[in-house]
Amino acid sequence: MLRYPSCNLSTYDRREFPGGTVYNGDCLDVIKTLPESSVDCIATDPPYFLGMTHNGQKGNFRDLSICRPFYRDLFNEFRRVCRPEACIYFFCDWRGYAFYYPLFDEILKAHNMLVWNKLSGPGNHYAFIHELVLFHAGKGANIGGTSIISDIRAFTSGAKSTDGDKVHPTQKPVALIQKFIEDATAPGALILDTFGGSGATAVAAVRSGRRFIIMEQDEGYYHTTCKRLENEYR
């Protein structure tokens, strides 16, 4: 039987699924309960404080400045919980890149910046059609020599609600996340997402035969993730 790290999280709401656990709580609190060197891959999409934020509200540069201690602590936790060969995929947009990159590189070491051409963008001005992914490859990591840029550029938007609207304002396609974790890990590996959103990473893990730990602070998106997983396991 596949096993994933046990956590003492009696103060947090959580749901157990055959392949992993979804937590409703602050990721910085939850991740500190995970064992060292227990995670095979991190794929996460943090709040976009410049422009669209994690909860769909407009943010500004000052929001990122006050979050520096939070991300320094989080990246140090990434380093602690990851296995030596683990890969990390950390999404950001062009406005947040200058903030995230120095911290990410200092603590984790950035080995590459991937570009996802999403072929569409919001608003009435020149469209933002690209998003960036800070990539860390652990010692001995092997992603199989795949052509990531050409393979992901045509991936389109993710899950929709029953009325056709996206279930999360900044969600990523399941196929995109699935490609990343399949490039970086073998079946049965443990995937961590500290900003779970509407559950794309969880669904990608299920479809690729990986285990998962998902953390989401927003109660509404937590329940959305659980519902999507219920549908996956039917």
Model-derived segments and spans:
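Cysteine-dependent PTP/DSP-like catalytic domain, specifically the C-terminal lobe
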Residues: 218-234
